[in-house]
């Protein structure tokens, strides 16, 4: 049976082909070069995590596993709420078919605050990296479960060329080994959610954290964090940086919820 990553890859490749037909790579590069310099995603996380926790706060309307998460969806207001609550960075979904995201959400959210922003999407072509920069993104995501080694290297090089940071995402030891071997970016995210089954367990971070920290990389714990107790449990294994979306997106007062989560 086709898993979700296979389905997403199929429609993403179609999206990229259509985008290239609309906007040439040369025109897209011109748009990217016209953007203000990147805000420094990894550095913002470092500064916040040195004082407590570094939070990548996610702006996400829906997901394949949970459906609609936030009916009252206002990206600029959410970005300001996250900033007021003490987040270090934003993560904004730009995938439409599976997450009801959009490039306009990334643009609007980043313009509404001073935080660096990650384009949260499934990338398979350097064209998408240039898109991210043209939309103002300061960081991209490379999901090791969805790309081969050579493509991961190509995407990282493209991001570095634009002055962007890279968040590398892994879910198991094999993906981590590949990331450590082929990629140089310091931010290494552990997704506690299996993207093929959607099962979530914090044991994934517990298992991989020692290796990541021993290699001198900067651990980011992703998915499955809902309470201060969850954060404390992950901090006990060395996590000081977190990517959190759903639990905050479901709160009426996002700024207060963010503040409370970071106060633990």
Curated annotation (Swiss-Prot):
It comes from the Bacteria. Pathway: Amino-acid biosynthesis; L-tryptophan biosynthesis; L-tryptophan from chorismate: step 4/5. Gene3D superfamilies: Aldolase class I (3.20.20.70). Pfam families: IGPS. It comes from Rhodobacter capsulatus (strain ATCC BAA-309 / NBRC 16581 / SB1003). Its EC number is 4.1.1.48. It catalyses: 1-(2-carboxyphenylamino)-1-deoxy-D-ribulose 5-phosphate + H(+) = (1S,2R)-1-C-(indol-3-yl)glycerol 3-phosphate + CO2 + H2O. GO terms for molecular function: indole-3-glycerol-phosphate synthase activity; phosphoribosylanthranilate isomerase activity. Keywords: Amino-acid biosynthesis, Aromatic amino acid biosynthesis, Decarboxylase, Lyase, Tryptophan biosynthesis. It is an enzyme of class 4 (lyase). InterPro entries: Aldolase_TIM, Indole-3-glycerol_P_synth, Indole-3-glycerol_P_synth_dom, Indole-3-GlycerolPSynthase_CS, RibuloseP-bd_barrel. This is Indole-3-glycerol phosphate synthase. Belongs to the TrpC family. GO terms for biological process: L-tryptophan biosynthetic process.
